[in-house]
Amino acid sequence: VNSLTMIDVISRALNPYTQNDEFMKLAEQPEMRFVISNTTEAGIAFDPACKLEDAPASSYPGKLTQLLYHRFKTFNGDKTKGLIIFPCELIFLNGHKLKETIYQYIELWNLGNEFKTWFEEACGVYATLVDRIVPGFPRKDIAAIKEKLQYDDNLVVQAEVFHLWVIEAPQEVAKEFPADKAGLNVLFVPSEAPYHERKVTLLNGPHTVLSPVAYLSGVNIVRDACQHEVIGKYIHKVMFDELMETLNLPKDELEKFANDVLERFNNPFVDHAVTSIMLNSFPKYETRDLPGLKTYLERKGELPKGLVLGLAAIITYYKGGVRADGAEIVPNDAPEIMNLLKEL
């Protein structure tokens, strides 16, 4: 399946760093109801250096707290003006984590019990899990795409057909957000835990370690890594012999899911650059692979060699330098993490 779909539901885009006044005015719109975010695993974090008067706060939870507080004041604490918040960051129970971080800002900024109560009673922050491989801008195919469209579009985004969004929320929220009626694979469930553990461990975990191993070997696309004589065996070993051994679900179910993941990795229409996966590799490894490494060590009494190799490749990548083919290695992460790893 290879198709083009025009996305026509976005009315505008705002940069809070250059348009903060307009960004804050969003909170003044009475019809505003939903906030959806994806700022990667590194995004939901508390930064005590953020101030209420910052325009804007540097962290995402800080910006969101500013927006919520402005809405609270604008509508004088009207509980019908609360917001429903769906974080999509790949953190287990991301909604709980985001909520905890907002509470930290409420305390840090002394925003008061009235606002805290309004946030607790009028707003909902729900844990979610997203599953879709989205490589981004299709540089290799953009000329053919523009020819087919008959106009220039510099915001083309490539994605696989498969998609799943699991939201841990009550049915009242599902009624307000009836995505299924739009033909979308969105599930409202009592717990996202089983979906999260399986997906993060057997899709994102392999992604995170295969990418630096492949890149340092001169392989730039996930599909090519899977089909590589050596790296392909490495990916299979990490998935089936290491990570799968750390899960408590039926083995036949896990094997089917893992084989489906490999089929998605091999998608001939999706050129998923490993460098796009390696953004913020260290926090990704911490959430996607380190739990499996620890569980494997506890159960087997030895370290999983494939996951350790992946970590070594990440550290090597963060040190920068030049690949064997002459390509410059340019890592991207928080400065404190990059400086630490360069010193190893």
Where are these regions (language model features)?
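Substrate/ligand-engaging "lid" and interaction regions
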Residues: V1-L344
